[in-house]
């Protein structure tokens, strides 16, 4: 697969009618020399001596790019209160990985929140994959101030195995249930890892000891493209069949209204609207409410 040809084709996405305003707004932003970035729960960008005019321009640019799914971010006094409190997931996972000096990929990286957080561990390379011109634009907006060495590819999980180099650690958070062939996806990730490499993944799950999965008829939690929601044992089997040597369950956690909620930065429905109003243990379709399993799968050294 010729990824460079694909890159050139996908750069044309940035000329789409709905995306051009984002690109123009980013280009119009002033350059700032004195910027301090803190990579905590809130990715905090502080620009010295920011004028009221510039602050307003930054605010209007951020508002233009709604919805903001992942975050939160702060730019001086502007707080981007994203739909997801992404620090909850990151802080849950961080004790389970060491990225120093490693080549790291984040599949389905959205606007780069996790990538920015990972900078503090000083990996050798950080590469994000997400075939979304909107999320890429949000990343470029933030990167205008942060100026990191992160590479953002408008590519998907199916391209990882063909990438120019392999990875020591791959993150794939909230992607697997969107794929109609989860084992094929896991095989692609497996091929993209170096020997001894690790995959850190989360996905929706259902309770039970059996090796089975829920297959929604149409939608799950109002999401149309959810194909398989496995038990933990079924997920382990998928990973082993994809070639991984071992699978460790890091955490199981129900998604709650603190982690995912509607804010002024999304203008759409959120988790509260996806659950049965009479029984929050179920989705509006009658399925078990969203619960996630977090795993680490290891490729044999």
Curated annotation (Swiss-Prot):
Catalysed reaction, written as an equation: carboxy-S-adenosyl-L-methionine + 5-hydroxyuridine(34) in tRNA = 5-carboxymethoxyuridine(34) in tRNA + S-adenosyl-L-homocysteine + H(+)
GO biological processes: tRNA wobble uridine modification
EC number: 2.5.1.-
Pfam families, A to Z: Methyltransf_9
Binding of carboxy-S-adenosyl-L-methionine, residues: 70, 84, 89, 108, 130-132, 157-158, 177, 292
Source domain of life: Bacteria
Keyword Amino-acid biosynthesis annotated: no
Signal peptide location: none
GO molecular function terms noted in the UniProt entry: transferase activity, transferring alkyl or aryl (other than methyl) groups
Alphabetic keyword roster: Transferase, tRNA processing
Function text: Catalyzes carboxymethyl transfer from carboxy-S-adenosyl-L-methionine (Cx-SAM) to 5-hydroxyuridine (ho5U) to form 5-carboxymethoxyuridine (cmo5U) at position 34 in tRNAs.
NCBIfam families xref list: PRK15068.1 (NF011650), tRNA 5-methoxyuridine(34)/uridine 5-oxyacetic acid(34) synthase CmoB (TIGR00452)
Family: Belongs to the class I-like SAM-binding methyltransferase superfamily. CmoB family.
Assembly notes: Homotetramer.
Name the record gives this protein: tRNA U34 carboxymethyltransferase
Source organism of this protein record: Sulfurovum sp. (strain NBC37-1)
Gene: cmoB
């Amino acid at each position: 697969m010729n990824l460079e040809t694909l890159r050139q084709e996908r750069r044309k996405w940035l000329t789409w009618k709905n995306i051009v305003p984002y690109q123009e707004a980013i280009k119009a932003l002033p350059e700032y020399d004195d910027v301090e970035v803190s990579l905590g729960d809130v990715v905090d960008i502080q620009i010295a001596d920011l004028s009221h005019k510039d602050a307003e321009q930054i605010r209007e640019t951020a508002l233009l790019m709604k919805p903001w799914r992942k975050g939160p971010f702060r730019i001086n006094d502007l707080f981007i209160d994203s739909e997801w409190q992404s620090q909850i997931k990151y802080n849950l996972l961080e004790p389970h990985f060491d990225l120093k000096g490693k080549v790291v990929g984040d599949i389905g990286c959205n606007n780069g929140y996790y990538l920015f957080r990972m900078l503090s561990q000083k990996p050798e390379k950080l590469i994000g994959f997400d075939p979304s011109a909107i999320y890429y634009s949000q990343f470029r907006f933030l990167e205008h101030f942060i100026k990191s060495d992160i590479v953002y590819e408008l590519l998907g999980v199916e391209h990882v195995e063909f990438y120019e180099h392999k990875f020591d650690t791959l993150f794939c958070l909230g992607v697997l249930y969107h794929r109609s062939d989860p084992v094929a996806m896991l095989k692609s990730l497996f091929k993209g890892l170096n020997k001894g490499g690790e995959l850190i993944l989360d996905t929706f799950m259902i309770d039970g000891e059996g090796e089975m999965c829920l297959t929604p008829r149409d939608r799950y939690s109002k999401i149309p493209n959810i194909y398989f929601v496995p038990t933990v044992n079924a997920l382990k089997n998928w990973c082993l069949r994809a070639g991984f040597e071992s699978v460790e369950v890091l955490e199981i956690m129900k998604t709650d209204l603190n982690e995912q909620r509607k804010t002024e930065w999304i203008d759409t429905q959120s988790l509260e609207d996806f659950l049965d109003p009479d029984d929050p243990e179920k989705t509006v379709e009658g399925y078990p409410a969203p619960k996630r399993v977090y795993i680490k799968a290891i490729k044999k050294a």
